């Protein structure tokens, strides 16, 4: 990892494959590694009215990302080579950035029968049923054994459906004050506990999606201390907001929900001590109509690729919570390391001093629903570079 200013960039021999022109850029712009997001929803095939691989890639470029991993809640679900090829062909046709698909754990993400894991393994980054937790202990154990035999990770959306009770936001102060049904923290951490037992039994490499609770941090920290091969991610929104920041607006609805201040502080501590390995956006665009029905009626999911770095830089780095180097580890280095990718000649040029207000009208994504709209941030993207080539943004 290296962070350079433009004037240093101009004199180094490290970037031999760079074919762009930066001589006119200000010397105090920073050159950062291209980010890697292991958790995005690009909606193609099946839901192109929400997002396409092309619009999602443009959104990623506009946030300094050069590699993304796309979740399998598509139509058709990539549970067979035939279905996966539809997505692979669309990715190849776009070709803007590195887009790597997940294969599903189960057929149709229904949790009842394993996908054609062996057939699709060579073409996917890992296996996940993100959007749904695998409810059956036996099914998850079978999936872990199969993934281990294929040297692939299981990437788990941890959610025990039996504990949801119709909830749609965190079961905390805001829910109680405003008569909303809450989702308890146990719905997340109880399934993490179950999965860790299965990981110990099977020896699979295991990664937990979007952790949001203090208990999840504590459980994963303990598992790491015991030598379990486990990594995890959290999202920018869980590090910046607590449930008292909620508004009855669909742009504050996602799964898992924004939780308490105690949870937020525990997540930050997990970032600082290495329990949490990476930050992923869970970029999940929907149409305006699908996000315009308040907290109760809107679909889960927010967009995040274009706001992640400025939000985190402003709220964590400029405030002294973590260093810029640590943030780069979380957004660029650790994700690639865990999933066996290399950085190559990918980087982005940032004006870290620029202050501006986030406006969803500026997003390249088809989705415009963001809890960060209206916030003032520092860190404006100037250029994104993939394999030494400046990308149009």
Regions found by a protein language model. Give the residues of each.
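Divalent metal-coordination and catalytic microenvironments
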Residues: 28, 39, 60, 64, ...
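His/Asp/Glu-enriched, well-ordered alpha-helical/loop segment
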Residues: 177-205, 272-273, 277-279, 284-350
């Amino acid at each position: 990892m290296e962070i350079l200013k433009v004037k240093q960039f101009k004199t180094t021999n490290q970037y031999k494959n760079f074919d762009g022109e930066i001589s006119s850029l200000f010397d105090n712009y920073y050159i950062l590694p291209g980010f890697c997001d292991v958790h995005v929803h690009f909606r193609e095939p099946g839901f192109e009215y929400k997002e396409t691989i092309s619009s999602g890639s443009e959104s990623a470029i506009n946030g300094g990302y050069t590699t993304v991993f796309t979740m399998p809640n598509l139509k058709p679900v990539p549970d067979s080579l035939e279905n996966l090829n539809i997505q692979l062909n669309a990715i190849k046709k776009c070709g803007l950035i590195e887009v790597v698909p997940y294969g599903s754990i189960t057929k149709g993400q229904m949790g009842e029968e394993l996908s054609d894991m062996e057939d699709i393994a060579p073409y996917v980054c890992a296996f996940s049923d993100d959007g749904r937790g695998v409810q059956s202990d036996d099914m998850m154990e079978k999936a872990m054994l199969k993934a281990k035999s294929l040297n692939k990770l299981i990437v788990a959306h941890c959610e025990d459906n039996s504990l949801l009770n119709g909830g749609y936001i965190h079961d905390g102060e805001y829910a109680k004050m405003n008569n909303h049904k809450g989702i308890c923290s146990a719905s997340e951490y109880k399934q993490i506990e179950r999965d860790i037992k299965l990981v110990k039994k099977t020896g699979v490499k295991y990664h937990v999606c979007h952790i949001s609770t203090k208990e999840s941090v504590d459980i994963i920290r303990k598992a790491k201390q015991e030598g379990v091969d486990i990594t995890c991610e959290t999202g920018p929104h869980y590090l910046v907001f607590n449930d008292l920041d909620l508004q009855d607006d669909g742009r504050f609805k996602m799964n898992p929900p924004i939780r308490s201040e105690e949870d937020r502080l525990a997540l930050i501590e997990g970032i600082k001590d290495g329990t949490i390995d990476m930050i992923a956006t869970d970029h999940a665009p929907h149409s305006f109509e699908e996000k315009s029905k308040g907290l109760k009626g809107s679909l889960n999911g927010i967009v995040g690729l274009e706001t992640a770095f400025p939000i985190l830089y402003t709220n964590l780095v400029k405030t002294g919570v973590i260093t810029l180097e640590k943030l780069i580890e979380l957004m660029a280095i650790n994700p690639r390391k865990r999933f066996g990718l290399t950085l190559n000649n990918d980087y982005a040029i940032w004006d870290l001093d620029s202050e501006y207000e986030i406006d969803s009208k500026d997003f390249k994504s088809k989705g415009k629903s963001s809890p960060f709209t209206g916030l003032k941030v520092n860190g404006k993207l100037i250029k994104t570079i993939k394999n030494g080539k400046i990308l149009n943004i």
